[in-house]
């Protein structure tokens, strides 16, 4: 089993539990160059809010999309957009990534922005 399969296995366990609870979730995905965040409905079929370092609004604020500063900007932006959509409480879906570095920075910025999880 390689590193990617291990991460996907962890992600599958988390998503199965969140699907069982029908919880609105904040899903995070990261690559070497970018980080993406989506608020997904409890049924799992609708994206209610999204933010990423690919967007021009974020790219104008940060030079590099693959660092903690960029993750903090995305975290604040996703919290702002989720609150605008009427969402206060979410379940954090780290997609099998360790809660460290950019994933942690995004989560803490989203909490500072007003999301509860």
Curated annotation (Swiss-Prot):
InterPro entries: Ribosomal_uL18_bac-type, Ribosomal_uL18_bac/euk. It holds the Pfam family Ribosomal_L18p. It comes from the Bacteria. Keywords: Ribonucleoprotein, Ribosomal protein, RNA-binding, rRNA-binding. Gene3D superfamilies: 3.30.420.100. GO terms for cellular component: cytosolic large ribosomal subunit. GO terms for molecular function: 5S rRNA binding; structural constituent of ribosome. One of its GO terms (biological process) is translation. Part of the 50S ribosomal subunit; part of the 5S rRNA/L5/L18/L25 subcomplex. Contacts the 5S and 23S rRNAs. This is one of the proteins that bind and probably mediate the attachment of the 5S RNA into the large ribosomal subunit, where it forms part of the central protuberance. PANTHER family: 39S RIBOSOMAL PROTEIN L18, MITOCHONDRIAL, LARGE RIBOSOMAL SUBUNIT PROTEIN UL18M. Belongs to the universal ribosomal protein uL18 family. This is Large ribosomal subunit protein uL18. It comes from Azoarcus sp. (strain BH72).
């Amino acid at each position: 089993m390689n590193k990617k399969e291990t991460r996907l296995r962890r992600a599958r366990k988390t998503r199965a539990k969140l699907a069982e609870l029908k919880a609105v979730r904040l899903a995070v995905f990261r690559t070497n160059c970018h980080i993406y965040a989506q608020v997904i409905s409890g049924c799992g079929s609708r994206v209610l809010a999204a933010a990423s370092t690919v967007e021009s609004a974020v790219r104008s604020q940060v030079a590099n999309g693959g660092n903690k500063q960029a993750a903090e900007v995305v975290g604040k932006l996703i919290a702002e957009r989720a609150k605008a959509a009427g969402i206060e409480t979410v379940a954090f879906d780290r997609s099998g990534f360790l809660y460290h570095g950019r994933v942690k920075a995004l989560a803490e910025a989203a909490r500072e922005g007003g999301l509860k999880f």
